[in-house]
Swiss-Prot record:
SUPFAM superfamilies given in the database record: CO dehydrogenase molybdoprotein N-domain-like (SSF54665), Molybdenum cofactor-binding domain (SSF56003)
Cofactor: Cu(+); Mo-molybdopterin cytosine dinucleotide
Name of the protein in question: Carbon monoxide dehydrogenase large chain
SMART domains in UniProt: Ald_Xan_dh_C
Organism in which the protein naturally occurs: Hydrogenophaga pseudoflava
Organism phylogeny: Bacteria, Pseudomonadati, Pseudomonadota, Betaproteobacteria, Burkholderiales
Alphabetical keyword list: Copper, Hydroxylation, Metal-binding, Molybdenum, Oxidoreductase
NCBIfam families assigned to the protein according to its UniProt record, in alphabetical order: CO_dehy_Mo_lg
Gene3D superfamilies: Aldehyde oxidase/xanthine dehydrogenase, a/b hammerhead, Aldehyde oxidase/xanthine dehydrogenase, molybdopterin binding domain
Reaction(s) catalysed by this chain's protein: CO + a quinone + H2O = a quinol + CO2
Residues with 4-hydroxyarginine modification: 384
Self-association state and partner proteins as the record states: Dimer of heterotrimers. Each heterotrimer consists of a large, a medium and a small subunit.
Length: 803
C-alpha cells in the first residue's frame, strides 16, 4: 500500500540518511554495559591459557623445566616450541614476508617473548603454573638502537637468517638489515640540492609508542575433533584475514574455520596482526580437544603487542630565498624490532611513508627508508593512521617550519606559497601518489580568519618583549594531507592478498533490511554510518536496517578495518550494492505503475511517475512485490553483493592550529586553543565525525606530550604499565574546536574520503610545532617528543629561559 504523500524534506529527515546528526545506533548497549567482548565469552569445558615469557632481551634457551608446573592440580598441559614442531607451528609467517617465532625455539629475541604456554582449569591456576616453569638462559649481547645494530661489529640478532643475502624486499646489506627502500628521483633531487641557494636539514626521532586500546588482545579457540571445525572468537580488526592465515597454518580447510570478532574495545592498528597467543590458543584447543581462552594483561599488551613509530629521520629541504621549495630529501632508519611484522603493503615495505611531500608542490623529491632488526618487540603498526603516514606528515611539517625559521618567514605564509593549487588536482606527486582533490588555500584562510591569527602573533610578540613574563607562548600551525582507503589492490596488496572490501544487502519482503560487511567496528559507529548510506541510497529508514560485521561464517570476505578504509572502501561497496538493488527496484516499480523505467523519477524514498506525484511506489511496496509477485522474467528477491576494489586511495586533509603557554618555572605546557579543520569529503554523520576527531586529537595529544617506550641498555622496557604510560583523562585533555570544508573525492561513489585517523596524524606535529615555536626566538628549530614538563623544563634551562 502506498505511504501517505509527504513533503520530500520531511521524508528525508525521517529516513535518518546521510548528513543529519543522528545518534549512534550502537551507543545504548555500550552505555548500559551490555557489550559482548572476548573475555565475556564462556563455553562448556573451557580451559584457560597463560604464557611463560622471557625475562631477558637476548639469550639462548638452555633448558625448560616444566615438571613442577605439570604436577600442579588443575594444570592440563605445558607446551613449548618442541611440542609445536610436529605441527610445524613453532614459526609462522608475518604479513611483511618475514617469519616470527610462535614460541621461542633455542633463542629469545626480546624481553617478554613467548617461551611456553600453560593450560589450566582457570586463569589463576595458569598464572601460578607459569611461575612454576623455570627456564635456563645464556644471555647474549643486546642491541636496542637500530643505528648500533648496523655497525660492523654488532651481534647477529637473527641467526635463523644467517647467510641470507636477500630478503622479501631485496638485498640485505648487513646481518641485522631487513631492507632499504626508496622512492622518487634521487639523481634529480641531488642535483637540485647541489645548486639550491637555500638548504636546511634536521634530524628528528619519532619515539616508539603503543596504541594501548582499552581492551587488550585475546581469543577463545574451540576445536571440534568430531567435525573438524574450528571456531575462534578473537580481538581482530581483520577476521577474514585471520581465517585465511589460520587455515594456511593449521591445514584446516577454510570452510571449516570460523573467526568471530565480537565487540572490540579499540584497535588503533594494534589488533590487525596475528599474535603468537592466538596461534597457541588454537593449538592448545586442537591438542586438548576443549575450548581454550587466552586474554593478555596490560603489561603483556604494552610489552609485546605491536608498537608504532620508532623512526630516526633526517630531512632536508632546498628552496629559493623567498621560500619556494625546490626539493625534499629524506633518509630514515626504522626500528622494526626482533621480527619484521609490520602490516605494510608488499610493494611498499616502508608503508606509505612516501606521502612525505605533504600538501606541497615540490618539484623534486627522494626518500630512503632502511628497516633494521633490534632486540625489541616486533610491530610497527599503523597506529590510527595509514601505514607510516603519521611519521611522514610529522617530518614534512617539521621541515617546513625549520625552513620558515631560517628565512624569517611566517609559518602560514610559507605554506600558502608552496601549496598545491586547487586547479592542479588531480595532482601527481614526485613519489607517484595521485591526489584526488583538495582546496588547501581556502581551508587555510578559513582557519586563520576563524582564530584571528594576526592577534595571536601580536600577543606572542608582546610576551617575548617582556623578559619577566612567567610564560612562553607558542603557536603551531600544520597543514597535512593523508592517504587512506587501503586500498587499490594494484598498489596495496599484502603478500598477494588484495585490499578490496565487500557488502551484502538483503531487503526483506516487508521493507526492512540487513547488511553484512567485511569490516569490523571498534568504536567507529559503523552500524549507524553504514545504515545511513543505505537509507540514502534506497529510501529505507535507517532504524530498520540491521548491520552485521565480524563473523566470517556470514559476512562476505573483506580485509577489515584500519587505515581509515571503512567508509572509503566498505562504504563504497555498500553504496554500489545498494545501487544494484535500486536498479532492480526501478524495474519492479515500472511494472507496478505500468510505465517505462525512463518515466520514473526517484525522490528520497520512492519512485514516482514523472509529472504525477500521486503515482509512486516506495521501497517497501517494491520489496513485497519482488518476493511474491515479481515481473515475468525477473528473479524473485531483492538483494545484492558488491566487492569494491578502489581505483585510487582517497586523500583527506586538514589545517590545525594550536596555541600553548609554557610555564618558565616548571616546564608545564597548557593548551590555550586548538582549532582543527578537517576535509574528509562528503560528510555522512557530523556527530560521529566530530567524535572521531575528538578521539584522534586526544590520542595525538597523548603521543606528543607524554607517551614514550624507553629501553635501558639490557633491553628492559622502562614503563610497561599505565602508572608510567601516559593516557590522558578528562582532566588533562584540552578543549577542541572543530571545523570543516567539503571537497568530495571524484572517484568515490559518494565522495567520502575517511576521517578517523586524520586528527591523530595532524595533531601530533601541531603540538610539537607549538612547543618549538615558543623557543623559536632563541634559535631553537626542533625539540623531540614527548614534550613532558621535565623535558621542556630542561630545554628552558638549556636556553636560559627558565625562571
Amino acid at each position: 500500500m502506498n505511504a501517505p504523500v509527504q513533503d520530500a524534506e520531511a521524508r528525508e529527515l525521517a529516513l535518518a540518511g546521510m548528513r543529519p546528526r543522528a545518534c549512534a545506533k550502537e551507543d545504548a548497549r555500550f552505555i548500559q554495559g551490555k557489550g559482548n567482548y572476548v573475555d565475556d565469552i564462556k563455553m562448556p569445558g573451557m580451559l584457560h591459557m597463560d604464557i611463560v615469557r622471557a625475562p631477558i632481551a637476548h639469550g639462548r634457551i638452555k633448558k625448560i623445566h616444566k615438571d613442577a608446573a605439570l604436577a600442579m592440580p588443575g594444570v592440563h598441559a605445558v607446551l613449548t616450541a618442541e611440542d609445536l614442531k610436529p605441527l610445524k607451528l613453532h614459526w609462522m609467517p608475518t604479513l611483511a614476508g618475514d617469519v616470527a617465532a610462535v614460541l621461542a625455539d633455542e633463542k629469545v629475541h626480546f624481553q617478554m617473548q613467548e617461551v611456553a604456554i600453560v593450560i589450566a582449569d582457570d586463569r589463576y591456576i595458569a598464572a601460578d603454573a607459569v611461575e612454576a616453569v623455570k627456564v635456563e638462559y645464556d644471555e647474549l649481547p643486546v642491541v636496542i638502537d637500530p643505528i648500533d645494530a648496523l655497525k660492523p661489529d654488532a651481534p647477529v640478532l637473527r641467526e635463523d637468517l644467517a647467510g641470507k643475502t636477500s630478503g622479501a624486499h631485496g638485498p640485505r646489506e648487513h646481518h641485522n638489515h631487513i631492507f632499504t627502500w626508496g622512492a622518487g628521483d634521487k639523481a634529480a633531487t641531488d642535483a637540485v640540492f647541489a645548486n639550491a641557494p637555500v638548504t636546511v636539514s634536521q634530524h628528528m626521532y619519532y619515539p616508539r609508542v603503543h596504541p594501548c586500546p582499552l581492551e587488550t588482545c585475546g581469543c577463545v579457540a574451540s576445536f571440534d575433533p568430531i567435525k573438524g571445525d574450528l571456531t575462534t572468537y578473537i580481538t581482530s580488526q581483520a577476521p577474514h584475514v585471520v581465517r585465511t592465515v589460520v587455515s594456511m597454518l593449521s591445514g584446516i580447510p577454510e570452510s571449516k574455520v570460523r573467526i568471530v570478532s565480537p565487540d572490540i574495545g579499540g584497535g588503533f592498528g594494534n589488533k590487525v596482526g596475528i599474535y603468537p597467543g592466538y596461534v597457541c590458543a588454537i593449538v592448545a584447543s586442537i591438542v586438548l580437544g576443549r575450548p581454550v581462552k587466552w586474554v593478555e594483561d596490560r603489561v603483556e599488551n604494552i610489552s609485546t603487542t605491536a608498537f608504532a613509530r620508532d623512526y630516526h629521520m633526517d630531512g632536508e629541504l632546498a628552496a629559493t630565498p623567498d621560500g619556494k621549495i625546490l626539493g625534499l630529501r629524506v633518509n630514515v632508519v626504522a626500528d622494526h624490532g626482533a621480527f619484521d611484522a609490520c602490516a605494510d603493503p608488499t610493494k611498499f615495505p616502508a608503508g606509505l611513508f612516501h606521502i612525505c611531500s605533504g600538501s606541497y608542490d615540490i618539484p623534486r623529491a627522494h626518500c630512503s627508508v632502511k628497516g633494521v632488526y633490534t632486540n625489541k618487540a616486533p610491530g610497527g603498526v599503523a597506529y590510527r593512521c595509514s601505514f607510516r603516514v603519521t611519521e611522514a606528515v610529522y617530518l614534512i611539517e617539521r621541515m617546513v617550519d625549520v625552513l620558515a625559521q631560517k628565512l624569517n618567514m611566517d609559518k602560514a605564509e610559507i605554506r600558502a606559497k608552496n601549496f598545491i593549487r586547487k586547479e592542479q588536482f588531480p595532482y601527481t606527486t614526485q613519489f607517484g601518489f595521485e591526489y584526488d582533490s583538495g582546496d588547501y588555500h581556502t581551508a587555510l584562510k578559513k582557519v586563520l580568519d576563524a582564530v584571528d591569527y594576526p592577534a595571536w602573533r601580536a600577543e606572542q610578540a608582546a610576551r617575548r618583549a617582556d623578559p619577566n613574563s612567567p610564560t612562553l607562548m607558542g603557536i603551531g600551525l600544520v597543514t597535512f594531507t593523508e592517504v587512506v582507503g587501503a586500498g587499490p589492490s594494484k598498489m596495496c596488496d599484502i603478500l598477494g592478498v588484495g585490499m578490496f572490501d565487500s557488502c551484502e544487502i538483503r531487503i526483506h519482503p516487508t521493507g526492512s533490511a540487513i547488511a553484512r560487511m567485511g569490516t569490523i567496528t571498534q568504536g567507529q559507529g559503523h552500524q549507524t554510518t553504514y545504515a545511513q548510506i543505505i537509507a540514502t541510497e534506497l529510501g529505507i529508514p535507517s532504524e530498520v536496517i540491521q548491520v552485521e560485521e565480524g563473523d566470517t561464517s556470514t559476512a562476505p570476505y573483506g580485509l577489515g578495518t584500519y587505515g581509515s578504509r571503512s567508509t572509503p572502501v566498505a562504504g563504497a561497496a555498500i553504496a554500489l550494492a545498494a545501487r544494484k538493488i535500486h536498479a532492480k527496484a526501478r524495474k519492479i516499480a515500472a511494472h507496478m505503475l505500468e510505465v517505462n523505467e525512463n518515466d520514473l523519477d526517484w525522490e528520497v524514498d520512492r519512485f514516482k511517475v514523472k509529472g504525477d506525484d500521486s503515482k509512486f511506489k516506495t521501497m517497501a511496496d517494491i520489496a513485497w512485490q519482488a518476493y511474491h509477485q515479481p515481473p515475468a522474467g525477473l528473479e524473485p528477491g531483492l538483494e545484492a553483493v558488491h566487492y569494491y576494489d578502489p581505483p585510487n586511495f582517497t586523500y583527506p586533509f586538514g589545517i590545525y592550529l594550536c596555541v600553548v603557554d609554557i610555564d618558565r618555572a616548571t616546564g608545564e605546557t597548557k593548551v590555550r586553543r586548538f582549532y582543527a579543520l578537517d576535509d574528509c569529503g562528503t560528510r555522512i554523520n557530523p556527530m560521529i565525525i566530530e567524535g572521531q576527531i575528538h578521539g584522534g586529537l586526544t590520542e595525538g595529544y597523548a603521543v606528543a606530550m607524554g607517551q614514550q617506550m624507553p629501553f635501558d641498555a639490557q633491553g628492559n622496557l622502562l614503563g610497561n604499565t599505565l602508572m608510567d604510560y601516559f593516557l590522558p583523562t578528562a582532566v588533562e585533555t584540552p578543549h577542541w574546536e572543530t571545523d570543516h570544508t567539503v571537497t568530495p573525492s571524484p572517484h568515490h561513489p559518494i565522495g567520502a574520503k575517511g576521517v578517523a585517523e586524520s586528527p591523530h596524524v595532524g595533531s601530533i606535529p601541531t603540538f610539537t610545532a607549538a612547543v618549538v615555536d615558543a623557543f623559536a626566538h632563541v634559535g631553537v628549530t626542533h625539540l623531540d617528543m614527548p614534550h613532558t614538563s621535565y623535558r621542556v623544563w630542561k630545554s628552558l634551562k638549556e636556553h636560559n629561559l627558565a625562571l
